[in-house]
């Protein structure tokens, strides 16, 4: 029996979501929790995130045999071995031909800025940043929407066959003392969102022009090579 695991994780506790040489990845921790329950099949992840990036909604799949017919019980037991940095939100039975990565229709991320006074207790979970013009940020993010060749918004080391992506949503909104950038696309390149966020901030700071941002989005020239910090970024939705 193949199952789909929907879960969240605190990225500050891991070196990234993928398996790591010293077993410090989210995939390693969740595989270890499954092994305590006698499930040793390879765990497959729908998305990869870098060190320090969080997920409020991540998805994985694994073959678990026919022993665990009570999925609510499996969820409860798996949480015992996954806490405190991973929380299993739901487990569903899926078809044998379900592909957790390649069946994805869209992914969503949110980047969270806090405009409150700095707190070391929140430093791993938001990017502390002065207030900015949210309307202007929305305008700049709108440049990303559509089918784009985002080769200048990609870190090296990815396994992508193409740098073409379709961005469905790129917007900014406010919530209490936070400003949030929301991205939805059919897929993302490695480092794409953090490069996008940093580029928008550069324009807001007057260190880069709108024309330069547009040229980078149009794959004409790269003006910004820097990434926004990982701690403000959250994988927030995966749709099939």
UniProtKB/Swiss-Prot annotation:
Formation of pseudouridine at positions 38, 39 and 40 in the anticodon stem and loop of transfer RNAs. It comes from Campylobacter jejuni subsp. jejuni serotype O:6 (strain 81116 / NCTC 11828). Substrate binds at residue 109. The keyword Zinc does not apply. InterPro entries: PsdUridine_synth_cat_dom_sf, PsdUridine_synth_TruA, PsdUridine_synth_TruA_a/b_dom, PsdUridine_synth_TruA_C, TruA/RsuA/RluB/E/F_N. The active site is at 50 (nucleophile). Its EC number is 5.4.99.12. Belongs to the tRNA pseudouridine synthase TruA family. This is tRNA pseudouridine synthase A. CDD domains: PseudoU_synth_EcTruA.
């Amino acid at each position: 029996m193949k199952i789909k695991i929907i879960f969240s994780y605190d990225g500050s506790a891991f070196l990234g979501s993928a398996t790591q040489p010293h077993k410090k990845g989210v995939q390693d921790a969740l595989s270890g929790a499954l092994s305590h329950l006698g499930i040793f099949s390879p765990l497959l992840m729908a998305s990869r995130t870098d060190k320090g990036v969080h997920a409020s909604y991540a998805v994985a799949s694994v073959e678990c045999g026919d022993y665990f017919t009570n999925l609510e019980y499996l969820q409860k037991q798996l949480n015992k071995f996954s806490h405190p940095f991973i929380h299993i939100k739901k487990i569903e039975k899926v078809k044998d031909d379900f592909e957790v990565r390649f069946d994805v229709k869209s992914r969503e991320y949110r980047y969270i800025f806090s405009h409150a006074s700095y707190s070391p207790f929140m430093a791993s979970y938001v990017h502390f940043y002065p207030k900015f013009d949210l309307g202007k940020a929305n305008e700049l993010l709108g440049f990303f929407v559509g089918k784009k060749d985002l080769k200048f918004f990609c870190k090296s080391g990815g396994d992508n066959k193409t740098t073409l992506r379709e961005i469905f949503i790129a917007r900014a909104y406010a919530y209490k003392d936070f400003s949030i950038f929301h991205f939805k696309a059919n897929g993302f390149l490695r480092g794409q969102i953090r490069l996008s966020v940093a580029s928008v901030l550069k324009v807001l700071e007057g260190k880069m022009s709108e024309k330069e941002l547009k040229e980078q989005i149009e794959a004409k020239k790269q003006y910004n090579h820097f990434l926004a910090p990982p701690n403000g970024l959250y994988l927030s939705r995966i749709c099939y």
